Amino acid sequence: MNSRFKSYNYKLFVASLVALAPLGANAKTAQTSESDTASADKEMVQVAYRKVAKDDILGGVSVVDVENLMKKNYHTYSLDNMQGYVGGWNGNSLWGMDADNAGYLVLVDGVPREANNVQPSEIAQISFLKGAQAVVLYGSKAAKGAVVITTKRGHNDGLKVEVQANAGLNVAKSYPEYLSSAEYMTLYNEARRNDELSELYSAEDIYNHGAGLNPYRYPNLDFYSSDYLRKMNSRYEATAEISGGGKRAHFYSNINYYRQGDYFKFGEAKNNNTQRFSVRGNVDIDITDDIKAWVNSSATFYDSHSAKGNYWEAASTWRPNFPQNAAPLISTDMIAPNAKAAWDLMSVAKLVDGKYFLAGTQANSSNVFADIYSAGSSKFTSRQFQFDTGININLHKVLKGLSFETHFAVDYATSYNTSFDNSYAVYIPTWANVDGKDMIVALKKEGEDKKSGNQNISGSTDNQTMFFSGQFNYNNTFNKVHNLSAMLIASGFQQSKSGQYHKNSSANLAFDASYNYAQKYYADFGLAAIHSAQLAPGHREALSPSLSLGWRLKNESFLKNSKVVDDMMISVSGSIINEDIDIANGDNRYYLYQSIWSSDYGYGWYDGSSDKYTYSKRGENKDLDFIKRKELSLNFKTSLWQKLVTLDASFFINSMEGYLISSPTFYPSHLNTGYPAASFMPILNYNNNRRVGFDFAANFNKKVGDVDLSLGVTGTYYTTKATKRDENNVEQYQNRQGKALDGIWGYKSAGLFQSEEEIKTSPDQSY
C-alpha cells in the first residue's frame, strides 16, 4: 500500500443549547436572571477569597445558580452538563487548558476538595474562574483555572424541612453489534490469505459455527446479547434538607442516599450496585454584632459492590468463536448418558442454575463468564470526613471598613477493597458423534472449586487535606462615588496521599486592591507571592501580578437613559502567573534541579573480577524556574430590553512558557552517551505553548404568564500552537513547532499500488 504522512489539526468548538420552561421558577446564571429577580447588583458571586456583586465582575468568571437550577433540571453530578450554561467550560477544562500534569483546581467552600464528593442538592452556586486575573490570588495550583463550589446555608428563621425523592432509568441507546463467529472466521481467513498465510478455519468449521445447531461445541458468543445485559438500569435517590435558626444562629443540613444499579443480568454481576449515604451540616453563628463564625462538616459513606472479572475489557478483545470447541457454559444435557466418568465429575461439580457446567480448554482454564459466576465478588469502600471552620471579625472600631477573617479545614478520606476470592474448576469436553448427534463422551477437569470464606482486604489508601487562610479585608466608599476594597491574604494547604512521600503543598501571600468610580470606571490589581519546594533554594519564590480595567458604558450619559440597553460593560485584563504544577519529568516532581550520580560494575583488569565505576545520569540546573502563564483577555457583557437578551463574551490569548525538557538537542551530543548510559544534560525550561480563542453565553429570557422561558447557547472556540520546541528531527514532518497542540498525527493512505513498476519506483516502506 502506498502511504504518505498526514497531520490532522483539530480546533475545538463546543456549543450547547439549553431550553428551560419551568413553572414559577427562576434559572439564573452569570448571564441571565428573570424579571422578578431582585436587583442584579445584589446578586453576589463567590470568587477568590471574597464575594463580589455580579455586575462588578471584570470578566473571566461565570456562575451557575445550582440551587434554583435543581428545581427544574435534576442532575446527579455536581458539574453535570455545566457546559450548557457556561461559555469557556467544555466539561474537562477551562479555556482549553491542558491537564497533562494537573488540571483546574476545585474548591468546595474555599477548601481544595473533589467535585464528586458534593451532591448537587447540597450546592448553592458554582463559580467558574477561567481568566488568569480571576485565579491569581490562589497562586500556583489554580494556574489552569478554578471551579469554586459553594454549598447551601441556612437563612430562614424557625424550621424548614424539605424531602425529595427521585427515581430514574439509565437506558442504553444501543449496544455494539458483535461480529458472528462465521463472519469473524471468514474475515480472519481472508486476512491470512492477504498475508500469504494458510487459512486457519475450514469451510466445515465455518458452516458449523454459522448454522448454530450446536452452540456448545461451536460457540457464537455475543457479549452484548440480551442473555447477559439489560437494556436499562435504575437509580434511586432521596434527600432531606433541614434548615432554620433564630436571631444568633442559622443552620442547614442535608441527608442524602442513592443507589445505582448495573446492566448485568447474570451471575454475581446481577447484584452489582453502588450506594452512597452522606450527611452535611453548615452552621452560621453571630457571636456578637462584630464577630461571626461558621462551621461546616460532612461525612460520606460510599460502597460499590461488583463481581469478579473485567467484562467490558473481555468484550473488546474476545473472539466470538472462542474458546475452541467449548462455550463458556455447557448444558449437562450434552453429556452422553453412558459417559459414566463425566457424570461422576458432574455429581460433585458446582453447576450454574443446576444444569450448566463451566467449560474451557487447557490453554484457557478461566474466562470472564466463569469469573462472574464463580470467582467471587469485591466491594470498594470509601469513607470521607470533611470539616472546616472560620471566623470573621469586624474591625470597624479600629478603621471603618476593616475586617479580619480566618479559615481552617481538615479533611480525611480512606478507601479499601474487600473481596471473597474463590477458585473454580472448568471442564474440557471431548466431543463425538453419538447416534447422529454431537455429544460429550468425556470430560477433563482443570482446577478446583474452592471457597475459603476468608474476606481479603487490599488497596488501602488514606488521604488528608489541611488548609489554612487568614486575611484582612477593607471595604469603604468615599463621597458616595469612590468605592475602594482591598485584601491581604496568607493561605496554604497540604494534601498527603498514601504511597506518596511528598505532600502536594501550596503556600502563598496575596494582595488585591479594587477601585471603581460610581460603578462606571473600574480597576483591579492582584498580586500573589508564591513559594514552591520543587525548585532550588534561592529560586523558590516568585511574584504573579494581574491588572484589570473595566468600563460600564451603561452609566455614561449617552446610554444612561437608553430603553434598549439595561447594562453594558467591557473590561480588559493582563496577567502573569508563575506555576509549579507543570514542573514534572514523568512522575518526578522534586529535586529536578539536582544532578544525579549512580554507580555500577563493569569489566575488570583481570579475569573473574569487576570494577565499580560512577557515572552521571543528569546534570545540575539550579536556575530551573517556574512555568509562566502570560495572558491577555477582553470581556464584553450586556443586557438588552429589560433582560430579554443577555450576552457574556470573552476573548483570550495566553502563552504557557518554560515547559521542561530533559535532553536538550542544542547541547553537545557527547554529554549524553549510550554505553554506559550516562548524561550530563540538565533539565531546562524551554518549550512554549499558545492558545487563542473566545467564549460566549447568550440567553433569551421571556416571562409568559406564570411560565419563565429561557433559551441559551454557549460556545468556545480556540486554536492552539506549539510556539517553541526543542527538536532536531531528520524529517520536517516530525517537528511539532508551529503546529497544533491537539493535532492527531499519522499516516494517510495514498491508495494501493497499481503496478509492479510503481512499486519499484516508490521508496522502500517499513513499519
What are these regions (language model features)?
Residues 77, 755-756, 761:
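Alpha-helix N-cap recognition
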Residues 126-128, 134, 272, 668-679:
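Solvent-exposed beta-strand/loop surfaces of large extracellular or lumenal domains
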Residues 282-291, 297-301, 333-335, 341-344, ...:
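Extracellular/periplasmic, surface-exposed regions of secreted and cell-surface proteins
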Residues 170-174, 416-425:
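Short, solvent-exposed beta-strand-terminating loops
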Residues 108-111, 615:
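Short gly/ser/thr-rich secondary-structure transition/capping motifs
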Residues 112-113, 356, 438-440, 766:
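Short, solvent-exposed loop/turn motifs
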Residues 5-7, 16-45, 49-104, 111-121, ...:
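Membrane-proximal, glycine/serine-rich, low-complexity loop/turn segments characteristic
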